């Protein structure tokens, strides 16, 4: 079966940031149902977050639905995991039955990838600082530290990678063995993310940039 782990993870992360969450549940897999959900969400929320449906498949309705109800300002980012990320705005229609959106009135929209780790990582990197800025907080960037690698990473991606890592007993960083974007265990058991530049090979003893989950979830 398919389990909607994103729903529970995102709810918990948002509440941790002090947000009031309006959970609209699972939207039926059609463009019109997605548009209706966006219209409903825009009337009651400052920020709309979706998980999945922002890629280019035949059943990925979120992007065209947002474009129909507002606009997409950003689509796709060159990171791994998490490339199919979208940011846009959804117009508010005002009084019930109004056909046109109210000029200048909108809810922000962030579309996250559907894979659990991708959704988790992009939430920490993009949604968290965005929400903090909406709350009036200026210092929103997590503080990274430099630590020493206890592993070899010899097949880097062309994109900027965020590798799930664990602290080793000797003080170095170890790599979580399964880096797949569907393996949410790596976020539960891991201690943070290594921010690795595009194409960068990592050898044991190299200095790496580390973002701890304690910092990212603070």
Residue spans for each PLM region:
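Short glycine-rich anion-binding loops that position phosphate/pyrophosphate groups of nucleotides
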Residues: 53-59, 114
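Conserved beta-strand edge residues that scaffold enzyme active sites
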Residues: 28-29, 55-56, 205
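Short acidic, glycine/serine/threonine-rich loops at helix termini
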Residues: 34-36, 60-62, 89
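Secondary-structure boundary/capping motif
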Residues: 6, 33, 57-58, 118-119, ...
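Phosphate-binding glycine-rich loops and their immediate beta-loop-alpha structural context
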Residues: 1-50
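Flexible glycine/proline-rich
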Residues: 67-218
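Catalytic-core segments of thiol-dependent peptidases
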Residues: 46-55, 70
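Short Gly/Thr/Asp-enriched flexible loops that form oxyanion-binding sites at enzyme active sites
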Residues: 57-69
């Amino acid at each position: 079966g398919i389990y909607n782990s994103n729903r529970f993870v995102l709810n918990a992360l948002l509440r941790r940031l002090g947000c009031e969450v309006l959970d609209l549940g699972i939207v039926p897999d059609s463009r019109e149902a997605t548009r209706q959900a966006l219209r409903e969400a825009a009337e009651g929320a400052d920020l709309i977050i979706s998980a999945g449906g922002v890629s280019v498949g035949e059943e990925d309705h979120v992007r065209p639905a947002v474009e129909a109800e507002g606009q997409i300002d950003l689509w796709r980012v060159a990171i791994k995991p998490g490339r199919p990320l979208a940011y846009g705005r959804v117009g508010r229609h005002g009084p019930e039955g109004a056909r046109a959106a109210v000029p200048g009135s909108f809810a922000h929209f962030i579309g996250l990838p559907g894979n659990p780790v991708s959704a988790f990582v992009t939430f920490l990197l993009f949604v968290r600082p965005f929400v903090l800025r909406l709350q009036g907080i200026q210092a929103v960037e997590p503080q990274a530290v430099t630590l020493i690698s206890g592993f070899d990473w010899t097949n880097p991606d062309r994109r900027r990678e965020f590798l799930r890592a664990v602290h080793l007993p000797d003080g170095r960083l170890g790599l979580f063995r399964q880096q797949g974007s569907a393996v949410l265990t790596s976020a539960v058991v891991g201690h943070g993310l290594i921010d690795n530049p595009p194409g960068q090979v990592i050898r044991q003893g190299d200095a790496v940039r580390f973002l701890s989950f304690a910092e990212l979830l603070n």
